[in-house]
Amino acid sequence: MSIIIFLSLICMPLIDFLIRSEINPHLEPVPFLVVLGNVQDGGSPHIGCAKSCCAVLWEHPDPQRKVTCLGLVDPVNEQSFIFEATPDFPEQLKALRMFAPFQKDGIPNGIFLTHAHIGHYSGLMYLGKEAFNSHQTKVFVMPKMQFFLEKNGPWNQLINEENIKIQPLTNQVHH
């Protein structure tokens, strides 16, 4: 059932767009989502798991199983964004580049972090000086996540060294 939902919500609109683009190259491109991962925060196989669901994966890892992450691509404005900076961040950025070849330096225009579970922010480590050494990569966060990143290492080092630039979000309800 979940594969049907995945195909109908993500793959089919993208495939439809690609097919129609071939038929009519003047078709206006539209923003779209790309599923870059759908596995729980701890990865796959899950650390310490000895159940049958993980046993095969310990022996034969599946390189397609990545921690939950979405890419948003806007081909009109040549922008891309990623939702969650997971432990699989480098591979997910590479996958996103396939859909957004216009990405400057391979880093999207922004990263949205939804909450402070380890699988949603730990990939920020790859933006530091020991790895990519990015410069002011925009990271969109709610106030609690902003406080967490600013007050805790090594994440505050990314802010202090200007590897990332926090973009505060607020929860506003419009009536």
What are these regions (language model features)?
Residues 1-4:
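N-terminal Sec-pathway targeting helices
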Residues 8-10, 14-175:
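Binuclear metal-dependent hydrolase catalytic cores
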